[in-house]
């Protein structure tokens, strides 16, 4: 019987199935951070339970850590408590953790793949929505709640039901200036934020095969924003090349054995999907979100839509509310929208490829951050990404242009640390969510690629990076 990649991953991890379709699934890797783990560890302590498989867990503080000088510690008492609690719990249970001043510290969805802790064929969970990132490796990866974090710590299993299969095929070749971020925003714009509900999405096609692992991680990271349970990309030589030699990856005979299995992790030629979505890569322009949902997105060459032209009353109402919150007028060209702050970072776009792309634009433009831009942040996804960028001199390019070069962490992706928007401020952000208040109460978020964010910082408004010679 022919199977999809998702079918194979599911079948390989079912421990027991109920008649109603509920299955006990074995979990290979759990990633932990300071926000969703304290109550899980407390549950273990209250019940007197040990961690079932200590080596299957890897922890890091990322959401609440400061991205400025860390020698003073964490100023906010709640943030400090969460970080200290993770430190204490990991020490008590013997779980490997990259603490705040460890050079390997960073955003959980950056450090997992970077360390080789995410491998093809694995089930990977974390108490974080964007765990879908790890599906780029042909792994079944998804976010879970705190009670489920405790359940995995205690049993290494989860109860769940199988999703349906969706194929998103992107054939053709991307135009110069368009990126993986633009692909996934275009997909969400096409199917909506509920389009993937009940599905696991597999991304395939020529354009996907031509992406680096960093690009594939960006795609899968935002599968959740399309409503999907998880995102997947089949294993190929790009995957294997990325994994080899990393600290957690297999070595010697174990690697040879792993490769035999990994090379089976693709959808069979005649396997059937429950839904298929197709896009042409050459038609995907650089994207900019204009509203308060990732599905409210358009090509940079377009104008803010007019709610009066929307026939569906519910959609029209949502558009009107979004435009009011974003303080935008229908028919305004996206390229004329001025911005107050720029954020280059997050688990979506903070890897070395992203930093290079942004630095290339800054270097090519050869100017400083625009006077109307109050703050332009570059926040590498990990200490190792930061060190690599500094070896390449990328930090000097940013600092010379007036950007701030920060320490790794989640930073301005969400208003949970010192990096945030003030009410009414407008931000060009490489993160994944543009909900009301996501980056700070009253803050207005536009999601873009690293290149688009860098160009907006220099010009003071959105520009089409395809026109930057």
From Swiss-Prot:
Known catalytic reactions: (2R,3S)-3-isopropylmalate = (2S)-2-isopropylmalate
Matches recorded under SUPFAM superfamilies: Aconitase iron-sulfur domain
Top EC class, one word: lyase
Essential cofactor(s): [4Fe-4S] cluster
PROSITE patterns reported for this sequence: ACONITASE_1 (PS00450), ACONITASE_2 (PS01244)
Superkingdom to which the source organism belongs: Bacteria
Annotated GO biological process: L-leucine biosynthetic process
InterPro entries: 3-IsopropMal_deHydase_lsu (IPR004430), Acnase/IPM_dHydase_lsu_aba_1/3 (IPR015931), Acoase/IPM_deHydtase_lsu_aba (IPR001030), Aconitase_4Fe-4S_BS (IPR018136), Aconitase_4Fe-4S_dom (IPR036008), IPM_dehydratase_rel_enz (IPR050067), IPMI_cat (IPR033941)
GO molecular-function term, one example from the UniProt record: 4 iron, 4 sulfur cluster binding
A Pfam family the protein falls into: Aconitase
EC number: 4.2.1.33
Annotated residues for binding of [4Fe-4S] cluster: 347, 410, 413
Keywords, in A-Z order: 4Fe-4S, Amino-acid biosynthesis, Branched-chain amino acid biosynthesis, Iron, Iron-sulfur, Leucine biosynthesis, Lyase, Metal-binding
Cofactor binding description: Binds 1 [4Fe-4S] cluster per subunit.
Pathway(s) per entry: Amino-acid biosynthesis; L-leucine biosynthesis; L-leucine from 3-methyl-2-oxobutanoate: step 2/4
Family indicated by similarity: Belongs to the aconitase/IPM isomerase family. LeuC type 1 subfamily.
HAMAP family: LeuC_type1 (MF_01026)
Function: Catalyzes the isomerization between 2-isopropylmalate and 3-isopropylmalate, via the formation of 2-isopropylmaleate.
Subunit (UniProt): Heterodimer of LeuC and LeuD.
Protein name from the UniProt record: 3-isopropylmalate dehydratase large subunit
Species of origin: Polynucleobacter asymbioticus (strain DSM 18221 / CIP 109841 / QLW-P1DMWA-1) (Polynucleobacter necessarius subsp. asymbioticus)
Gene it is expressed from: leuC
